């Protein structure tokens, strides 16, 4: 009995075991299918799509091959049970331009829930037949070349949770049908040409992230937004929004980030409607037209970590309400009309790491304070105010200051010696003050200093050789002081140095030493003009300046233009992702300089790393211009004017194909202007005046558009008719020149004399040729 029961139990156990073995495995146990999972209609639709949407097999990890289960193809995901294609991710995979047509095979994949065609070189309009993909929850068509209006049919895809259309050329209004997308949690329309329709978004109660930035919106949500109770981040920067600040945003307790910079909002601002449970950590309303005082109600935003009120018209004393924002790590109220004393709370222990108060009218740093060790300040910008008196010693008590900008103020006295003991300095900008004395021996105990700008002061003495220890030095500007020293050959070994400006000091002596390696392998900009440098330069002088022959891999830019940058946030600090510019530490700073560029004094607020400049003007250099200058193929600006260079203009200059400015004026150059310079297509400013040049001026568009003054002082030049709009003849020696009336009388006489001289030989040659012809005429006929 017991045995039979045991057999019965064993039989049941085996039956249950085989039953579970026959069940399909869940998708969690992802192993390659032993048989084809993909449905034939789905496979055929994908193969048809491949014909209209070029996808090179070489860039697919798993190529689309008819003999392979389509569910294992690259970018394709299928339902594990039904074999329907539910996800298609082909981002970055199309190498040729294509457009989505209404009849596209894509719309046969009607079970798709995820569609990602970002960065696929798509062109044309979004077809209305996209509504066939009724199961879509995620749609990403970002970073393409799509045009036209967004089809209203997208509003029928009521399962959508995610729409990303950024980085296209879409225009018009947001379709009213978007009000049906009640499950939508992310909508990204960044960088298009939308102009309106944002009012419909007030119905999207599931929205968590909304990005309308970089469009042409004008009216901002006339409807109440407080119903968007799930909204966490809103980006509306770089539009044309007008009117008052949308106070209804402050009622949304879930909101974490508000970015409304670079619009045309105006009027006073009030934060009185702020929710008591506000989670707001970032508020950026910079670059608008807000007026009045910074409101005291700002203190209600107790969780703020980043506050940017810069580039507005706020006025009055510094706002004390900010001192109550105990979580604040980054504060920017630059470019306003604030005045009085610098707010005291920035000197006290807090979480503040970066503070930018520049371009205001602060005139008092406050009484001497003892900065306690709890202060975490890393970046401080007080530039372009009216601060005066000596730089206080206690500024050195900030143990971790990484960046300090006191430029464009009225500071006097010497640089505090304690600064040389600061071990964490990366950037020190004291430009345009009335500081005097000697430069301190910086980089004695630290090698972190990357940028030093002490231009436009009254410093004397020599350039401190301790700067040789600054291993990371990229930028050094001592322009407009009274420094008397020889050329700093010892800086040539700094492999990081990109910008060296010694202009308008009292530097003297040669800039070449046969026993010293010149170095400067990464130098992009050197301006040593208006000093007392002398001597000749060897022909291989520029051979080691390899950076000026290196192509910077970016499209040509307008270097003086201050273009926008993408910001990345680390904690409370914002760093700028702008490696294309010299000085990329904080968004409050980029290295800047002024330069005589294209004949005009130009301020460069940011310095593009591909900007290559040599300015040796206003010295006493002699000898020939080195041929090796032609090796610097990426040089944009060359100024050797106001020296004593002799010899010919080196033809190798024609190898500098990107050259935009060439100034060789006020030298002793001779010979002809190389015709090959006329082939420099970017050359827009030329000055060869006041030399001893002769011969024809090259005929080209670049030379033909120059001012006549670019060639004056060269009596041997001719061919300037088109440039100077007047007749230029081959010059006659002074002793043979006469006044105009005498020349007119002599001209007919000279013409008759010339005719008589030519008549005699002409008659003689005629007789000789005639005799030969008549003597040998019969032989010619025989030969024929």
Swiss-Prot record:
Localisation: Cell membrane
Q: How does it sit in the membrane?
A: Single-pass type I membrane protein
Alphabetically sorted, this entry's keywords are: Cell membrane, Glycoprotein, Leucine-rich repeat, Membrane, Receptor, Repeat, Signal, Transmembrane, Transmembrane helix
| SS bond list | none
- Start-end of each LRR repeat: 109-133, 134-157, 158-180, 182-204, 205-227, 228-251, 252-276, 278-301, 302-324, 326-349, 351-373, 374-400, 402-422, 423-446, 447-470, 472-496, 497-518, 520-544, 608-632, 633-656, 657-680, 682-705
SMART domains assigned: LRR_SD22, LRR_TYP
Name the record gives this protein: Receptor-like protein 38
Q: Name the source organism.
A: Arabidopsis thaliana
């Amino acid at each position: 009995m017991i045995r039979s029961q045991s057999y019965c139990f064993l039989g049941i156990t085996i039956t249950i075991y085989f039953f579970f073995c026959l069940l399909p495995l869940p998708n969690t146990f992802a192993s390659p299918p032993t048989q084809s999972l993909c449905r034939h209609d789905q496979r055929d639709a994908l193969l048809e799509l491949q014909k209209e949407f070029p996808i090179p097999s070489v860039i697919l990890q798993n190529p689309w091959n008819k003999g392979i289960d389509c569910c294992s193809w690259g970018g394709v995901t299928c339902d594990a049970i039904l074999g329907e294609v539910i996800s298609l991710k082909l981002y970055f995979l199309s190498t040729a331009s294509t457009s989505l047509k209404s009849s596209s095979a894509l719309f046969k994949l009607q079970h798709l829930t995820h569609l990602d065609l970002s960065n696929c070189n798509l062109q044309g309009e979004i077809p209305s037949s996209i509504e066939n993909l009724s199961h879509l929850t995620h749609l990403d068509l970002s970073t393409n070349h799509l045009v036209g209006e967004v089809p209203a049919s997208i509003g029928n895809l009521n399962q959508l949770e995610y729409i990303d259309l950024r980085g296209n050329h879409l225009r018009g209004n947001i379709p009213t049908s978007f009000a049906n997308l009640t499950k939508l949690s992310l909508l990204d329309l960044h960088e298009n040409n939308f102009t309106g329709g944002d009012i419909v978004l007030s119905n999207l109660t599931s929205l968590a992230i909304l990005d309308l930035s970089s469009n042409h919106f004008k009216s901002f949500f006339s409807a109440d937004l407080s119903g968007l109770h799930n909204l966490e981040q809103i980006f509306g920067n770089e539009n044309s929004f007008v009117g008052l600040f949308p106070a209804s945003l402050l009622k949304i307790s879930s909101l974490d980030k508000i970015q409304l910079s670079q619009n045309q909002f105006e009027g006073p601002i009030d934060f009185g409607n702020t929710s008591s449970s506000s989670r707001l950590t970032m508020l950026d309303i910079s670059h608008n037209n807000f007026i009045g005082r910074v409101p005291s109600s700002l203190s209600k935003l107790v969780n703020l970590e980043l506050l940017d009120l810069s580039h507005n018209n706020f006025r009055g004393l510094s706002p004390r309400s900010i001192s109550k924002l105990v979580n604040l790590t980054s504060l920017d109220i630059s470019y306003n009309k604030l005045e009085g004393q610098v707010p005291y709370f920035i000197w006290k222990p807090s979480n503040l790491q970066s503070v930018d108060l520049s371009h205001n009218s602060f005139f008092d740093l406050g009484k001497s304070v003892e900065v306690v060790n709890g202060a975490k300040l890393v970046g401080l910008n007080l530039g372009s105010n009216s601060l005066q008196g000596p730089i206080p010693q206690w500024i050195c008590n900030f143990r971790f200051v990484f960046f300090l900008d006191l430029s464009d103020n009225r500071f006097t006295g010497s640089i505090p010696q304690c600064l040389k003991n600061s071990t964490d300095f990366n950037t020190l900008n004291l430009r345009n003050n009335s500081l005097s004395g000697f430069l301190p021996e910086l980089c004695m105990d630290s090698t972190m200093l990357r940028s030093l700008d002490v231009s436009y002061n009254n410093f004397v003495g020599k350039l401190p050789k301790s700067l040789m220890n600054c291993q990371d030095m990229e930028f050094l500007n001592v322009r407009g002081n009274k420094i008397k020293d020889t050329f700093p050959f010892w800086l040539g070994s700094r492999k990081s140095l990109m910008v060296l400006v010694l202009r308008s000091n009292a530097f003297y002596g040669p800039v070449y030493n046969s026993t010293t390696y010149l170095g400067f392998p990464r130098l992009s900009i050197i301006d040593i003009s208006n000093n007392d440098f002398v001597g000749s330069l060897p022909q291989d002088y520029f051979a080691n300046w390899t950076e000026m022959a290196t192509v910077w891999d970016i499209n040509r830019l307008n270097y003086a233009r201050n273009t926008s940058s993408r910001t990345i946030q680390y904690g409370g600090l914002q760093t700028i992702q702008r490696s294309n510019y010299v000085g990329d530490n904080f968004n409050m700073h980029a290295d800047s300089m002024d330069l005589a560029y294209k004949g005009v004094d130009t301020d460069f607020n940011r310095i593009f790393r591909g900007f290559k400049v040599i300015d040796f003007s206003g010295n006493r250099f002699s000898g020939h211009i080195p041929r090796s200058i032609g090796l610097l193929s990426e040089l944009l600006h060359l100024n050797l004017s106001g020296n004593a260079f002799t010899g010919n203009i080196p033809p190798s200059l024609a190898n500098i194909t990107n050259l935009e400015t060439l100034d060789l004026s006020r030298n002793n150059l001779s010979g002809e202007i190389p015709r090959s310079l006329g082939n420099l297509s970017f050359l827009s400013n030329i000055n060869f005046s006041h030399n001893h040049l002769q011969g024809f001026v090259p005929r080209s568009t670049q030379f033909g558009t120059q001012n006549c003054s670019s060639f004056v002082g060269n009596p041997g030049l001719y061919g300037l008719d088109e440039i100077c709009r007047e007749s230029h003849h081959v010059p006659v020696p002074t002793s043979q020149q006469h006044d105009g009336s005498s020349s007119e009388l002599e001209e007919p006489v000279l013409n008759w004399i010339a005719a008589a001289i030519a008549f005699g030989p002409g008659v003689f040659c005629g007789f000789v040729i005639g005799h030969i012809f008549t003597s040998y005429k019969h032989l010619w006929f025989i030969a024929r």
